[in-house]
Amino acid sequence: MLAVGAMEGPRQSAFLLSSPPLAALHSMAEMKTPLYPAAYPPLPTGPPSSSSSSSSSSSPSPPLGAHNPGGLKPPAAGGLSSLGSPPQQLSAATPHGINDILSRPSMPVASGAALPSASPSGSSSSSSSSASATSASAAAAAAAAAAAAAASSPAGLLAGLPRFSSLSPPPPPPGLYFSPSAAAVAAVGRYPKPLAELPGRTPIFWPGVMQSPPWRDARLACTPHQGSILLDKDGKRKHTRPTFSGQQIFALEKTFEQTKYLAGPERARLAYSLGMTESQVKVWFQNRRTKWRKKHAAEMATAKKKQDSETERLKGTSENEEDDDDYNKPLDPNSDDEKITQLLKKHKSSGGSLLLHASEAEGSS
């Protein structure tokens, strides 16, 4: 016959090496096998009765000892064993029995009092009633033990947390941000057709726009948030002007050199090719036309003023040439006196200076 201490070691190892699905079977086996067999007094060594032999064959348990290690009191006389039949002496069991193999729980129970043990009785009716009475409490204790085991492990703690990844959309792959080829593939998927394949008339844009420029990338495109409404110090709305990249302005200027006005489809194609909105292209062309008109008007005014001054200069030069021609002609004594008088009046100052120089020359001589 085995001792009680020799039986406790295999049971502890069985507690640690078992699997979680066998916890319920263990609880059902504990209903028939007392957890602390040393709490009961030693039984006489007389021959067992017929009822005890039947119950011992159905539920083997370790032999009972005389020592009470837990300090537990023996059951009261008013319990299930007080029905007239004395307690039975159960047959010795080995740790390799089928009931021991099936009764291995997942983790050792923290408190032995959580699993109530029923006292064996001699009659089959008392054993069935005790099994039905303790089935609910044993199932609850097994569930509590499984919950404690799950809570003690890190996986059990993390399993209770909500999984937000199922609620939010999956993040984009990191290669989209760190791989230019992946970004190019994404851009091609976003814009499947190039600008030249779009339906419509022959485009009039700058030829560089027809090819796939680097500013076609969505990351370099102007977003509507750039023209968002901000609040000033006084709480008034403050409209910010959108900022365009140098490549976009260069393409817009080249297109404006060819045409000052864009139709709807042309404006849509240009906005699509530059990554801008149609309203941004429309407003840019309006402002550019206004600037061009002012500059053109100033240039025209300057040219007109220059032309007028040139005309006046040419007119004065022609009059002087005519006068010089009349002056250089030799005087005819038989000509009209009026003509001679006009020539003298016109060149009076020059003639006076000549007379003055002649008089000075005579005085010096």
From Swiss-Prot:
Q: Which PROSITE patterns match?
A: HOMEOBOX_1, HOMEOBOX_2
Where are stretches of biased composition, namely Low complexity? 48-59, 69-92, 110-136
Region Disordered, as annotated, extends over: 35-136, 295-365
The biased composition feature labelled Basic and acidic residues covers 305-318
Task: Write down the SMART domains for this protein, in alphabetical order.
Answer: HOX
What positions belong to coiled-coil segments? none
Q: Name one Pfam family in it.
A: Homeodomain
Q: Which residues carry this modification: Asymmetric dimethylarginine?
A: 190
What biological-process terms (Gene Ontology) are attached? cell differentiation; cellular response to cytokine stimulus; cellular response to peptide hormone stimulus; central nervous system neuron differentiation; endocrine pancreas development; negative regulation of oligodendrocyte differentiation; negative regulation of transcription by RNA polymerase II; neurogenesis
Tissue specificity: Pancreatic beta cells.
Annotated GO MF terms:
chromatin binding; DNA-binding transcription factor activity; DNA-binding transcription factor activity, RNA polymerase II-specific; DNA-binding transcription repressor activity, RNA polymerase II-specific; RNA polymerase II cis-regulatory region sequence-specific DNA binding; sequence-specific DNA binding
Any one GO cellular component localisation term in the record: nucleus
Whether Transmembrane counts among this entry's keywords is no
Outline the segment boundaries, as ranges, of region: Repressor domain: 102-269
Comment on protein domains: The C-terminal domain contributes to sequence-specific DNA-binding.
Cross-referenced InterPro entries: HD (IPR001356), HD_metazoa (IPR020479), Homeobox_CS (IPR017970), Homeobox_NK-like (IPR050394), Homeodomain-like_sf (IPR009057), HTH_motif (IPR000047)
Q: Which residues bind DNA?
A: 237-296
Among Gene3D superfamilies, the record links this protein to: Homeodomain-like (1.10.10.60)
- What is the recorded function of this protein according to its Swiss-Prot or TrEMBL entry? Transcription factor which binds to specific A/T-rich DNA sequences in the promoter regions of a number of genes. Involved in the development of insulin-producing beta cells in the islets of Langerhans at the secondary transition. Together with NKX2-2 and IRX3 acts to restrict the generation of motor neurons to the appropriate region of the neural tube. Belongs to the class II proteins of neuronal progenitor factors, which are induced by SHH signals.
Q: Which SUPFAM superfamilies match?
A: Homeodomain-like (SSF46689)
The record's keywords, sorted A to Z, are: Developmental protein, DNA-binding, Homeobox, Methylation, Nucleus
Give the region (Involved in DNA-binding) as residue ranges. 307-365
Q: What is this protein called?
A: Homeobox protein Nkx-6.1
- Cell compartment(s), UniProt: Nucleus
